[in-house]
From Swiss-Prot:
Mitochondrial intermembrane topological intervals: 68-438
Side Mitochondrial matrix, residues: 22-48
Protein modification: Is synthesized initially as an inactive proenzyme. Formation of the active enzyme involves a self-maturation process in which the active site pyruvoyl group is generated from an internal serine residue via an autocatalytic post-translational modification. Two non-identical subunits are generated from the proenzyme in this reaction, and the pyruvate is formed at the N-terminus of the alpha chain, which is derived from the carboxyl end of the proenzyme.
Lineage, broadest ranks: Eukaryota, Viridiplantae, Streptophyta, Embryophyta, Tracheophyta
Listed EC numbers: 4.1.1.65
Catalytic activity: a 1,2-diacyl-sn-glycero-3-phospho-L-serine + H(+) = a 1,2-diacyl-sn-glycero-3-phosphoethanolamine + CO2
Keywords annotated in UniProt: Decarboxylase, Lipid biosynthesis, Lipid metabolism, Lyase, Membrane, Mitochondrion, Mitochondrion inner membrane, Phospholipid biosynthesis, Phospholipid metabolism, Pyruvate, Transit peptide, Transmembrane, Transmembrane helix, Zymogen
InterPro entries assigned: PS_Dcarbxylase (IPR003817), PSD-B (IPR033177), PSD_type1_euk (IPR033661)
Organism field: Oryza sativa subsp. japonica
Cofactor: pyruvate
Transit peptide, residues from-to: 1-21
Protein name: Phosphatidylserine decarboxylase proenzyme 1, mitochondrial
Protein family: Belongs to the phosphatidylserine decarboxylase family. PSD-B subfamily. Eukaryotic type I sub-subfamily.
Length: 438
């Protein structure tokens, strides 16, 4: 048998740095490394670097949210309405590779988390962003990644849909930022006090909105140029059973064009539902920037919703034109369409030069002219995190007033919003109603 001589360790030239056994070293092992003996019982586990980075990003997002919430509270207490005021930070954001950063964040979001850590991470997120975990359709342990958790479905019945046929419902959970009526071609939507953008720029040059605007404007202009015709008693009819005067405008109702902007916070439910029964005729994908969409960004970045990446669904419902724009943001570049799973947003090959993105990618759904029929409340899309949805739609506009003997009277919109700016709303709740006409 061969013998091996074991040499004693040479003295260290730096005694203070010499390796010495620690009498309590067995009490200070890393929590993420098991010894050989304990490994047989518990298994070895090393925290992935991607998971650690995800936790760090989670902490940063939480701190940023707390800071922004405090600023919002202070402004509300002072009664100050946010105004548009560009700053250096907004200009600096254009220099950052936000699209690449968002793709990296998306990769981190897809990292599978250890089963025993999932409840703790998801509960921490829920506390930070006010999410209701009781509505989740599955136990927390069954969501393998943060992305799966963010786009989670809800328990059946969590979002009852208003069944009134004369109403539109909210497509998302979120905060109502802006709402109103568009009057005439080229009408602007207010982004924030002091700055507006056109609905045509948001939806695209080939949008069917242009035809709806021109038709509505032409009808209104014709009525204003012939006021005598609308007041003439020859238009009235009398019911023999119950004498009553009817105005011709009630027999031939007009259509108005309305809009509603809803912001989804990171803690909100992230799926987009259909606001009405409608036919989705075309899809338009704009490859753009991925600026953030928090309150600071809204009041400092020009054309925020127009420049950001977005997917526009456009079609027809029983009252006319309707469109939904799902707008991406930093870390939310991926917009998923359930009616078109193959669509990919925030693609690496997309180029944006001199703030001019590539032309939009259009698709007309088959059968042409009919498209895809979706019911009110049906899921149609989803975000990875918080973002913004803009609805533009036609709704009935008729005269509720009766003309007096002197020919005077008032004209009001038959469609009324049930909500106002600043309200919190959930999927399925009515955003507006109109009265039935005989």
């Amino acid at each position: 048998m061969r013998r091996f001589r074991v040499w004693p360790p040479s003295p260290s030239p730096w005694p203070l740095l010499a390796s010495r056994p620690c009498p309590h070293s067995h009490h200070h092992r890393s929590p993420f490394h098991a010894s050989a003996n304990s490994g047989a019982r518990q298994g070895n586990f090393i925290l992935p670097g991607a998971t650690a980075a995800t936790l760090v990003m989670f902490g940063i997002l939480h701190a940023r949210r707390m800071y922004e919430d405090q600023k919002v509270v202070e402004r509300k207490e002072k009664g100050i309405e946010p105004e548009f005021s560009p700053d250096f930070k907004a200009s600096f954001l254009r220099l950052l590779p936000l699209r690449s950063m968002s793709r990296l964040w998306g990769s981190l979001m897809e990292v599978e988390l250890p089963v025993f850590m999932r409840p703790a991470i998801y509960k921490a997120w829920a506390r930070a962003f006010h999410s209701n975990l009781q509505e989740a359709a599955m136990p927390l342990e069954e969501y393998p990644s943060l992305q799966a958790f963010f786009i989670r479905s809800l328990k059946e019945g969590s979002r009852p849909i208003d069944a009134d046929p004369n109403c539109l419902v909210s497509p998302v959970d979120g905060k109502v930022l802006r709402l109103g009526e568009l009057r005439g071609p080229g009408t602007m939507i207010e982004q924030v006090k002091g700055f507006s953008y056109s609905a045509a720029s948001l939806l695209g040059a080939s949008s069917s909105l242009h035809g709806a605007e021109e038709e509505d404007f032409s009808r209104e202009h014709t009525e204003q140029s012939n006021p005598a015709d609308s007041n003439a008693k020859s238009w009235w009819r009398v019911s023999v059973a119950k004498p009553k005067l009817w105005d011709q405008t009630l027999l031939s109702p007009k259509k108005g064009i309305f809009y509603c902007v809803i912001y989804l916070h990171p803690g909100d439910y992230h799926r987009v539902h259909s606001p009405v029964d409608w036919n989705i005729i075309k899809r338009r994908h704009f490859s753009g920037h991925l600026f953030p969409q928090n309150e600071r960004a809204v009041r400092t970045i020009r054309n925020l919703y127009v420049e950001n990446e977005r997917v526009v669904l456009e079609g027809q419902w029983k009252e006319g034109f309707v469109a939904i724009a799902a707008i991406g943001a930093t870390n939310v570049g991926s917009i998923k369409l359930y009616i078109e799973p193959e669509l990919r947003t925030n693609r690496a090959g997309s180029k944006i030069l001199n703030s001019q993105p590539e032309p939009p990618d259009d698709r007309v759904y088959e059968p042409v002219g009919t498209g895809v029929m979706v019911k009110k409340g049906e899921e149609i899309a989803g975000f990875k995190m918080g973002s913004t949805v803009v609805m533009v739609f036609e709704a009935p506009v008729v005269s509720k007033a009766r003309w007096r003997e002197d020919g005077s009277g008032t004209v009001t919109s038959d469609f009324d919003f049930c909500i106002k700016a600043g309200d919190r709303i959930r999927v399925g709740e009515a955003i507006g109603r109109w009265t039935s006409r005989e």
